């Protein structure tokens, strides 16, 4: 018999790594299914015509209708410069550039633009699922899957897809979600390239629609709830996202000319303008309650909560008080 001792086999040492990889199921097949579901859900809108604000940004916008030649002006002026030659408050050059491309390729053919809305919405839904699944990898995959399906199928998003102008919402959301995707990659790999990609994605979101500026608050919240990062790590990771926001705000100011008063707002566009004093806040809470109710019970829906769609009220309205109570008791 040999006196040599058997040497331990080093192969099992690689198993923990394999197990760690197996913890996260393959996400892209699920993502493809979500994209297909979203695409088919809204495919019937592909033959819709121009509606609502589509006229001011596309069909009756002489800058957009110049096609490729008009693109430089879309970055130099506000988004409705080609519709009315006056002060404007919207600066969304990325979706406007897309509209100019589409007009150049297929002039006055809304089918192409509707198709792009459907496609981009489907892709953003797939990206949302993958991003949520990675941030919530300690949870059952069913949670991000159901959350994404609830999001893409919710009736309040019908107008976003069916109204070509709402491309700004879709593109902004897609880029913001992509920023979260790369941010998670940075937090798990510590690769600077991933952080750069996240910042670039966020910058593109800002130039798609202004409300992406609120993303600066989403970053620390995501890190607080879904990572084990301490306060210092959260603050240091969030700070770089302030720079793109500042750059966008300064560019927007240079184009529009004012941040606080870009032009007069009329009650036909915003009912809160007609509410004075304490009634302003009462109606603001009524609208917040309406948004919450539409999220839970999306019927009936309205394409525009403009003047008199929701008549002005006061603090004696039980709906205002109920809304105030609901938001006051919301989880902090």
PLM region spans:
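Polytopic membrane enzymes that build or remodel cell-surface glycoconjugates and lipids
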Residues: 2-332
